[in-house]
Amino acid sequence: VIGGEGIGCVIYPASHYGRDALVGIALFLSSLAQKGCKVSELRATFPDYCISKNRIDLTPEIDVDKVLEAVKEKYAGERINDRDGVKIDFADGWVHLRKSNTEPIIRVYSEAATMEEADALAKKVIDVVWAVVG
């Protein structure tokens, strides 16, 4: 199991449970050594995806957990993962909604084959959030 954040931090429980960018570098270099290839060769084995990063600014009185539950209900026909917020898997990409623990905001990450598709997926779900909030 490995975890990571967009700011470059990696959490690798086999090493320790803290955020550590150097662990990510060590894992990457280890992978290069095991595969015996160059960075460009390793990169070529991965598909291209675009990620859109957005946020929804709310007010403190809004119950973000209830909003996320409503989004889950709206997309009940899609594959949903709610281990860390709400991640909705669509046929052409995904959207992950994650509440902040320090601010009244929801972070919205989406991924698709093109930036336009990633932005469109994010907008579709953001519009649902605003419809729920009213």
Where are the regions that the model predicts?
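Phosphate-binding and adjacent anionic-ligand microenvironments
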Residues: V1-G134
